[in-house]
Swiss-Prot record:
Source organism of the structure: Mus musculus
Region Interaction with FNIP2 and TSC1: start-end pairs: 285-621
Function: Molecular chaperone that promotes the maturation, structural maintenance and proper regulation of specific target proteins involved for instance in cell cycle control and signal transduction. Undergoes a functional cycle that is linked to its ATPase activity which is essential for its chaperone activity. This cycle probably induces conformational changes in the client proteins, thereby causing their activation. Interacts dynamically with various co-chaperones that modulate its substrate recognition, ATPase cycle and chaperone function.
Keywords attached to this entry: Acetylation, ATP-binding, Cell membrane, Chaperone, Cytoplasm, Hydrolase, Membrane, Mitochondrion, Nucleotide-binding, Nucleus, Phosphoprotein, S-nitrosylation, Stress response, Ubl conjugation
Stated name of the protein: Heat shock protein HSP 90-alpha
Gene: Hsp90aa1
Chain positions covered by the region annotation Disordered: 225-279, 701-733
Pfam families: HATPase_c_3, HSP90
Annotated spans, Required for homodimerization: 683-733
Entry comment on modification after translation: ISGylated.
Amino acid sequence: MPEETQTQDQPMEEEEVETFAFQAEIAQLMSLIINTFYSNKEIFLRELISNSSDALDKIRYESLTDPSKLDSGKELHINLIPSKQDRTLTIVDTGIGMTKADLINNLGTIAKSGTKAFMEALQAGADISMIGQFGVGFYSAYLVAEKVTVITKHNDDEQYAWESSAGGSFTVRTDTGEPMGRGTKVILHLKEDQTEYLEERRIKEIVKKHSQFIGYPITLFVEKERDKEVSDDEAEEKEEKEEEKEKEEKESDDKPEIEDVGSDEEEEEKKDGDKKKKKKIKEKYIDQEELNKTKPIWTRNPDDITNEEYGEFYKSLTNDWEEHLAVKHFSVEGQLEFRALLFVPRRAPFDLFENRKKKNNIKLYVRRVFIMDNCEELIPEYLNFIRGVVDSEDLPLNISREMLQQSKILKVIRKNLVKKCLELFTELAEDKENYKKFYEQFSKNIKLGIHEDSQNRKKLSELLRYYTSASGDEMVSLKDYCTRMKENQKHIYFITGETKDQVANSAFVERLRKHGLEVIYMIEPIDEYCVQQLKEFEGKTLVSVTKEGLELPEDEEEKKKQEEKKTKFENLCKIMKDILEKKVEKVVVSNRLVTSPCCIVTSTYGWTANMERIMKAQALRDNSTMGYMAAKKHLEINPDHSIIETLRQKAEADKNDKSVKDLVILLYETALLSSGFSLEDPQTHANRIYRMIKLGLGIDEDDPTVDDTSAAVTEEMPPLEGDDDTSRMEEVD
C-alpha cells in the first residue's frame, strides 16, 4: 500500500503502522465523492468545523461533571492553518479527541446508518451539501484533498495518527510528533486545482457563510509580510530586542500552530543580516484573526441589542440593501428550548408565490451549528416572506429531512413561530404608516393564511384592511367596520370585483348605500378564496351583496310593500323565466336595486361573477367544476324601474308579443355584463344592439347600405337565433 511505504521512512522507534480496509459502503461513498464533479466543494470546511464544534461540545459537557477533564487544555477553540508551501490546510480543535478504537471505528470500519441513505440520495440528485445530515461529513474532505491526515489525542489514550489517500484503505499509527495535549488536528493535503482554499479571502468567505455562528472562537493563522522602517542604529537595536521578545512570546504561546505553518528562523536570520544595510526591511510574521467574533446575535439579551445591530445582522443574513421593517427576538424555555430572531422585510421578493421558490427563508441552527435554510416544516407557506434564524437546543445535530418531517420538537417550534409572527404583525398594526407599507407588500400572505390556517384564522382576520363605501381613500379593519354598524344591522356586507371604482358603481350596492349601510370592497382575486373560509367576524356573518337571499334591515311597512310588488310582478317573472329557460335558475323581484332595471345574482354556494372570471383565467382549470359551480344564476328585476314596469304591461297586454322575448334576452345579457359576468356569445349580443340602434335611428332593415361591400358583409352575417328571431326584432318598436 502507498500509505505503508510512506511510513517506512519514519524513525525506527515509531510503532508499526497498521493498515485497515474501509468498510465497503464507506469506500463506495469516498469513490463517489472523489470521482463526481460537485460545484459547491466549499462545504467540506463547514463539515470539519462542525465536527470540531461537536468535539468541543462533548468535552465541555463532560467537564460539567468532571472539571479535571479540562486539565489537558482549558481553552476551547478551533484554529485554521493554511500553508501554501506544503499545500495543506489544517483544522485544529481542542475538543474531546479520539482513542485508537474511535479512530478505527469512526473513520472507516463501521458504516454510519446514514452512509447508504446518503449515497442513494446523491445518486438521486441530492446536493452534496446534505452530507452532514447523514453523519458522514468528514468524508467531504476528499472533495478537495488527495490525502487526509488526522492526528488526535484523547484523555484516555495516547496520541494517534490516521491517514488515507482514499485508495480503499487507511493506516493508523502512534504519533510521536508534537504533543497535542487534547483534541484533533485534520491536515488536508489539497489537490493541485484546489489551492483556492489556502487563500485568506476564500477561507474567511466560507467561514462567514457557513460557520459564522459556531459557539467557539475560530482563528485563522496566516503568514504575512510587513515592511519595517529603520531610522538609525539605536532604533535598529531597540527594534531587534523588541522583535526577539515578541518572537519568544509567540513561540511559547503558539508553538504547535507555528510549526505547522513552517518555522521562520532561517528567514529571521537572513533578515538580521540584511537589516544593517537597508533602511526598509520585509519581515514575516503569523497573523491571527478570529473569524467569528460576532457572538450569535440571537443568543444575546434583546435589551442589549440596538436597532442598528439588528439591521446589520439582517443585511448580512439576507443580502437585502434595505433595512428590515420589523423584528421579533425571543426565546422559549421549559420542556423545549430554542431561540429565534424573525424579520419582516420592507418589500416582497418579486417571486414570492412562484412554485420553485424556497418554501421559507428561516435558517435552522442546532446549538449554533447551521443545519439548513429550506426546512419546509419550520413555518407555513403563507409566512414564507419572514426572514430569520431559529436555534434549537433539542434537535439532534445530524437530523435529516425525513426525521424533521416526523419531529414533534419541530411541530412545537413551528407553532411558536406562527404565534410570534402574528404578535409581530399585531404590534406593527399599531403604527399606521408602517403597517400600510407592510400591508401593501404582504396582504396576499395574510389572506392566504386565512384560507389555509384554520387555527389562526381569527387572529389573521383582525389584520385585514379594506376600502369600504364609507372609508374614502383609507383602508379600514373589520373591527372598525363593526363599530360603525347600524343598530339593527346583523351582517357585514361585502362585494368582490376587479377595481374600487367598478364595485363602488355596481348595481348591487345601490340600495345599501341608500340605506346608509357600509359595504366592504374586496378587489383582489385572493379575496374570493379568503372570504370562502372567513364566514364571520366577531359573531357577525359576512354576506356577499351579489348573492341571492340578501337580507336588509327593513321595518314592517317596507316588508309589506315588498310583498305587494312580488305579487304584482309574479307573472312577469314567470314569463321571463320561460324565455330564458336554462340560462337562469329563477327570476325574482329584487330588494337591492334602486337605479338599475335588473342584475344577475348567484346562489349562496355558487361562484360570484368575479370568482367565475378568476376561474376562467386559470390555465389548468377543471372544466367539470366550471359547469356546476358557474351555472346557478338568478335574475333579479327592479319593480320600481320604468323599463321593468313597461315590460310588464307589454307582456300582460299580449302574452304572445314576440318582441318581449328579444327585450328580455337583451336585458339579461346587459345585466350579465353590468353584474361582472362575460357573455358566451358577444357577437350575437352586439348584433342585437346594432339592430336596436338602427331602429332608434329610423333605418329600415331592408334599406340598402351605402357601400356594396358592406352590403355583402351584412348578407353574410349569421342569423341571431334562427330566422324567426330576425322577424321578432323587426317588430320591436
